[in-house]
Swiss-Prot record:
GO terms for molecular function: rRNA binding; structural constituent of ribosome. The lineage of its organism: Bacteria, Bacillati, Actinomycetota, Actinomycetes, Mycobacteriales. Transmembrane segments: none annotated. Disulfide bonds: none annotated. Belongs to the universal ribosomal protein uL4 family. This is Large ribosomal subunit protein uL4. GO terms for cellular component: ribonucleoprotein complex; ribosome. SUPFAM superfamilies: Ribosomal protein L4. Part of the 50S ribosomal subunit. It comes from the Bacteria. Residues 62-73 have a biased composition (Basic residues).
Length: 220
């Protein structure tokens, strides 16, 4: 494994130096099974889980026996809210529940690094100095810059948390997902065709990831 070097693209179409993508983050083995498990857990955790149907004991009405037990020639009934009645309760219906799954942090990190490595190996990671120069947001400039970087449909833009200018510039662009470095996750990386990092966001992500790895080694 070796560190990958990328040019830092500027809004005027030039380059301003290079950055290194650490091999332990951007050149690891991508396990499809692991990424599948982590993405499934992430999507499950996003489910609201507030579905609910009423049982025969919760439906309004039906407290009185509809007709006497014997002598009518009809099948005996105890309530008009029994499940086989129209308007009756539901049997074995959905109830509120938590769909989240416990996923170890190591698995989450390994899946993310595998997804980023896959994008890096296919030259689908780009690094920019800033999305729009200056302090004035411009959706037009942001759109032109992103289209110059890639012609693929879905783009994941990773920017600094305080980069309000870039966020406002790209917020209305279709098929552009905006995250800060701390929000980067396996699902959004895999869903996107290309990942565009600002220099600030890339440095933040690398520092956090490598710092966490060093702390884990020290604990051992």
């Amino acid at each position: 494994m070796s560190n990958l070097k990328l040019d830092v693209q500027t809004a005027d179409g030039k380059t301003n130096g290079t950055v290194e993508l650490p091999a332990e983050l951007f050149d690891t083995e991508a396990s499809i099974a692991l990424m599948h498990q982590v993405v499934n857990a992430q999507l499950a955790a996003a489910r609201q889980g507030t579905h609910k149907t009423k049982t025969r004991g919760e439906v309004r009405g039906g407290g009185r026996k509809p007709f006497r037990q014997k002598g009518t020639g009809r099948a005996r009934q105890g309530s008009i809210r029994a499940p086989h009645y129209t308007g009756g309760g539901t049997v074995h219906g959905p109830v509120p529940r938590d769909y989240s799954q416990r996923t170890p942090k190591r698995m989450i990190k390994a899946a993310l690094y595998g997804a980023l490595s896959d994008r890096a190996r296919n030259e689908r990671i780009h690094v920019i100095e800033e999305l729009v120069p200056g302090q004035t947001p411009s959706t037009k400039q942001a759109k032109a810059f992103i289209e110059r970087l890639t012609d693929r449909k879905n783009v994941l833009l990773v920017i600094g948390r305080e980069d309000i200018n870039a966020r406002r510039s790209a917020n209305n662009l279709p098929n552009v997902q905006i995250l800060d470095a701390g929000q980067l996750n396996t699902y959004d990386v895999l869903y996107s065709d290309d990942v565009v990092f600002s220099v600030e966001a890339l440095h933040t992500f690398v520092e956090r990831a490598t710092g966490a790895a060093e702390e884990a080694k020290e604990e051992k």
